[in-house]
């Protein structure tokens, strides 16, 4: 595999992708994240410098840091919200036996890969259209 100079190399756990006007955005959680605020990344899958932002998992709020300063437009917010509310691509079940949605999966990815800070079990799924 050829690594381009502009690519970052780190562990990531991809939750999925959404597409807007031909641009594919990936939603992922970094593994062993040094930050103590549970968040996920939303970025242009093919051009990381074109669009990249971070969003908190527990509330509808941006977690801007470093070069990750972009803001979602209304269409991107709706795509993100629809994605988070949708069932996971691979069938997964929560502890009550209900099928997991993508937001629950993102929570699980954070908790599985970032042991310093876990998301409380009573956290309510935010409405990401309110970003």
Regions found by a protein language model. Give the residues of each.
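Metal-centered catalytic cores of metalloenzymes
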Residues: 1-131
